[in-house]
Amino acid sequence: MPKRTKILDKNQLQQKVNRLAWQIYERNHMESEIVVVGIQNRGVELAKRISKVISSISDIKVIVATVSIDKDNPYDSDLVFNLTETDIENKVVVLVDDVLNSGKTLMYASSEFLTVPLVKLSIVVLVNRNHNRYPIKADYAKEI
């Protein structure tokens, strides 16, 4: 197995997570509740970290949810959420993934929210590669 290149150390990663959490809080400080939805696998871990920071800096109730998607063939399988539509209805939803590359995964995952009335849908990524082939953008991103 080839050796993986380490992009961020633990402290650098936490700095990026802290900044993302603060940005989300700053734009949603008037909300009483935020739903943070992580895309399996690494998006879920990032969502949990961001949620933990938001909870530590504010009184906003943060609900962490997950969505499972086949990233290689998203159109061939259904998305699997661990929340129902009524759990996210009329709330701020923050969709989280580790990397925005072509935009296919985030486009497919975000399409599920189009039939649900939301206060707002935002997208968060740790890395934005800017190779977009789909009309989707990250509202919050940390360039590495």
Give residue ranges: language-model regions.
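PRPP-associated nucleotide enzymes
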Residues: M1-I144
